[in-house]
Structures are given as C-alpha cells and as structure tokens.
C-alpha cells in the first residue's frame, strides 16, 4: 500500500426503512473511489444495528452491497481517531483497523439524523457529511420547515400530527388551505410512507401508514400543477459552497407523485432531466436559494435541496444531507452535468472531511 493512500471506511445498510437504498448507494460510491488513492474497508450495518466487516462478500462490480448478518463484528473506539477492533473473525485476539476518514452512506433514521454523526464525533474521526446539528435539523422536516420559515424562505403550508395529538381531515384542510393533502413521516426519506389524500377516508389511511414509520408526521398542502426541481450543494475543503446545475423529476402519470415505487421499483416510474429546462433567471434564483438553505440548516459537506416550482413561485420542499448515490440518483448526476464527475466528487467530499477534522482538532477543548 502506498504511503499516501487514504484509508476510507464505507458505512452502509443501517437500522432504517432505507436500508436497501443505502446498499445501492454504497455500491456506486465504492466503484467511484479511485483504488490507487483510497484503501477501502466496507462496514455493513445490519437491520438490527450490528456493525460487521463486509469486505469478503462484496466486489466493486456489485449493484448493491451485501451486509453479511454473521460477519465479523466491528467496534469503533471512542476517541480512537479512526481506530476500530474486529471481533470474531477467527483470530486469537481482536484485530485492529485504522481509518483516516469514514463515509457514512446511510439514509434515514440512525444514519442521516445526527445519531451516527454524534458517534463519529465521539470517535474523533474525520467523516463525510454534515455534523450533528445540520444532520438533525434537516432530517426532521417539521423542524427544518420552521427554521426555513423563520429565515424568510418559502415553504409549503403544513401542520404536524402525532398519535397522541391527532388532527382531523377537516382541521388539516383548514390549516393548510387545501382539500388535497400530502401526508409523510417527518423523519424519513426516499418517499417511504408518503401518500396523497383527498377524502377523510384516504386521510385516515395515509396517517396510519405514515405513523408506521415515524411518531411524528407532516401534513402538507398539495401544490398543483408543480415541477419538482432539485439542486446539489457541495462545500469544498476551503469552505467554498457551490450549487450545481438543476435537475427535474417528472413522475409518470400512473404514480401521480415521486413515490418509493416510482423511484426504485418501476423502471418507467419517472423521467429525470439533467440539466432541467428552467429559465435562466429562475434557475439562478433556485441555486441561490439552495445555498441559503444550506446555511440556514447548518449543513456542511453536501446536501441535495428539493424544490416545488409553481409558475414563478418557488417553495423549499426538503433537504437531504446524505442524498442517494444510486445509479439513478440526482445528486451525482447534477454534479456530472456541472462538470464534476463522480470520482472527482468523491475526492472533494473526502478532502472536505479531512480538512474539517483537522480544523476541529485545533480548537481548544480544555482551559
């Protein structure tokens, strides 16, 4: 191994309804990392939350990485600066691994919501993505929308609901000013658990579905007609924040909106347009708004900012601090269209993680 090779651990899988999306994203990232520059270790997280060494069961050609349920367990050491122990691989004593940077390719709860970021902070290791505050703020759509609204950024009218504090269809319609509603879990992505409701019966079923995935759900006004426009944001190692060319998602009429099935299980579920055909002045407004959103929510490293466009009106929909990197995912496609191919994007993300960690270690932690 060359002396200047960077040791990267890819975390994937996880205790989340987006476990399978994570496995596909991680495979794409694994293929994109230059083998001459990076020594990669694959760490799978089972649906039960167990960390396992996954190198032996995965190849760079895989379309989705495998999490071996009985693989050797990995334990990341607190304050270990990237040191980890491998348990149960047949060795007489625990084996030690060391990483320079960790790439958490984890979507949804227990990976994108600040919990993993907190663990990595305690491990004192460089990692890709937003820190605890940005991850948590962006993941909770209720909190994110309140912060964006307070900052003067446009959002779709919404109301929140929990099982302990239910909201009737009539009250929701009155609150958001529309009889056609979207219901979604507050802390989930990949369109998991999202439904559209136009009647009290549909509303009740939609709330029951969303509450299966989260204790808090969001009820939003349905904007129609609408264009779903996305923008990728990237922070470089020197702190410069840039916005990409825009992308547009056009769901098939059979789906009605960009559902989980339209994204991942139906090859004809949606058409993706990168770059999006948006009037230059409007496109510039959206890109500027994307970087503002990035700052308001304390994002770092990377984020995908999703917008609804209704005529000349632009609404911030949501922010993903660990966006998908599957073969169909928009974040890498938008940077590709901007002139940054995925291997160079990986370089930029890892460089940012290393530079940030070095800066943070220089801050005084004791008097």
From Swiss-Prot:
TM helices/strands, residue ranges: none
Catalytic activity: 2 D-alanine + ATP = D-alanyl-D-alanine + ADP + phosphate + H(+)
GO cellular component: cytosol
Keyword Manganese: yes
Disulfide bonds: none
Listed EC numbers: 6.3.2.4
Superkingdom per UniProt: Bacteria
GO molecular function, a single term: D-alanine-D-alanine ligase activity
Annotated GO biological process: cell wall organization; peptidoglycan biosynthetic process; regulation of cell shape
Positions annotated to bind ATP: 174-229
Keywords annotated in UniProt: ATP-binding, Cell shape, Cell wall biogenesis/degradation, Cytoplasm, Ligase, Magnesium, Manganese, Metal-binding, Nucleotide-binding, Peptidoglycan synthesis
Gene3D superfamilies, per the entry: 3.40.50.20, ATP-grasp fold, A domain, ATP-grasp fold, B domain
First-listed, main subcellular location of the protein, grouped into a coarse class: cytoplasm
Family: Belongs to the D-alanine--D-alanine ligase family.
Protein known as: D-alanine--D-alanine ligase
Species of the source: Bradyrhizobium sp. (strain BTAi1 / ATCC BAA-1182)
Lineage, highest ranks first: Bacteria, Pseudomonadati, Pseudomonadota, Alphaproteobacteria, Hyphomicrobiales
